[in-house]
A protein has these predicted regions:
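ATP/NTP phosphate-donor binding region
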Residues: 1-61
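ATP/nucleoside-binding phosphotransfer catalytic cores, i.e., glycine-rich phosphate-binding loops
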Residues: 186-187, 192, 217, 227-315
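Glycine-rich beta-strand-to-loop/alpha-helix junction loops that act as flexible
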Residues: 9, 64-66, 89-91
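Calcium-binding acidic motifs and repeat modules
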Residues: 314-351
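Catalytic core of DAGKc-family lipid kinases
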Residues: 30, 37, 79-196, 200
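Glycine-rich phosphate/pyrophosphate-binding beta-alpha loops
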Residues: 142, 146, 199-212, 281
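Gly/Ser/Thr-rich active-site loops/lids in small-molecule metabolic enzymes
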Residues: 157-165, 214-235
Length: 351
């Protein structure tokens, strides 16, 4: 058997490159003749190599890098009739898919060692068709003014909710959040109206938080569709705080939350709506999203995968608490229901 490690040499201060010998050893001991390819700044470098490696018969492709590298590798193999197994070694900032799979995110060698358990499953892949362009994603798609703002920030903050925490600190950007007209068709109905954004989720982890689509499954053939209908700034911040405070947004009347296998989204007029795929610009609507059920086999410890999140992500608690305090201060509202309106500035001063 042969394995091809496709890695981003610049991810995490070149951490993959520094651990490459040990990573090779893990896969060699698992029975794979292993080689590597370092991605280049050229567009679609990882995608092209993944497609090439699959076509010449590699049995396993290892995507080592951030979510962008993993997305490229998936795009390289998802359209093929014969697809190799996929493994991921997270070396980026958010590492959403590794988080959803419960793959170690702070130790690359331990992430590689997941293969030693000899476990895998077939994961769903999202297909997005825009005009004549076909793309794939494995975590999140979306559109609307809020997702478009993510293109203006540094790459490490490009995830939607990571960016929210960023621009609440920079209040000058908040007035830019405005609803736009949307027409969204899904399995059980049609949404027609103004919305700040819509999200098409395959996993429960978005921007490092696991409560946005808490009941998302990785292999059920369904997207989680989330449409944020609110256009009021205070309501919007309250809604985000609910997301971060234990997934309390699911019953919010300003949210459409449903499961669907296919989505068609477009602006009802000639206006432009950019589409975000796994945190990057993917093209312009109209777009058709299709869930490709159990499309790619991925190496993962199936014993450890938490199919539905029933508690807050402990790793994000500090960020969530700080965000909620910021929102409470800006809106003068008790967001978390503890009977107090907190101020992060006040607490910083006291400390």
């Amino acid at each position: 058997m042969r394995a091809r490690v496709i890695y981003n040499p610049t991810s995490g201060r070149e951490i993959v490159k520094k651990n490459l010998v040990e990573i090779f050893q893990v896969y060699e001991e698992a029975g794979y003749e292993t080689s590597a390819y370092a991605t280049t700044p050229e567009p679609n470098s990882a995608r092209n190599e993944a497609e090439r490696a699959a076509k010449v018969g590699f049995d396993l492709i290892v995507a080592a890098g951030g979510d962008g590298t993993i997305n490229e590798v998936v795009n390289g193999i998802a359209g093929l009739d014969k697809r190799p197994k996929l493994a991921i070694i997270p070396a980026g900032t958010t590492n959403d898919y590794a988080r959803a799979l419960h793959i170690p995110r702070n130790n690359l060698v331990e992430a590689a060692k997941v293969i030693q358990k000899e476990q895998s499953f077939f994961m769903d892949v999202g297909e997005a068709v825009m005009e004549d362009k076909l793309s794939y994603f494995i975590n999140i798609g979306g559109g609307g003014m809020l997702t478009e703002l993510t293109y203006d920030v540094p790459s490490q903050l490009k995830s939607v909710f990571g960016y929210l925490a960023y621009f609440v600190k920079g209040a000058e950007m908040l007035p830019r959040i405005k609803p736009i007209p949307m027409h969204i068709e899904y399995d059980d109905g049609i949404f027609e109206g103004e919305a700040t954004m819509f999200l098409v989720a395959l996993t429960n982890s978005i921007g490092g938080f696991e409560q946005i689509a808490p009941d998302a499954l990785l292999d059920d053939g369904k997207f989680t569709l989330i449409v944020v209908k609110s256009s009021n700034l205070v309501d919007m911040m309250h809604l985000v705080a609910q997301v971060l405070n234990g997934g309390k947004h699911l019953s919010n009347s300003k949210i459409l939350y449903t499961k669907t296998s296919k989505i068609i989204a477009r602006p009802p007029n000639s206006s432009n709506m950019m589409i975000n795929l796994d945190g990057e610009y993917g093209g312009n609507a109209p777009v058709t999203f299709t869930n490709l059920h159990q499309h790619v086999e991925i190496i993962a410890s199936t014993d450890d995968i938490q199919k539905a999140v029933d508690k807050k992500d402990e790793n994000a608690e500090d960020v969530e608490d700080a965000f909620i305090k910021e929102v409470e201060e800006l809106t003068n509202t008790d967001i978390n229901g503890d009977g107090e309106i907190h101020s992060s500035k006040k607490e910083d001063h006291e400390n």
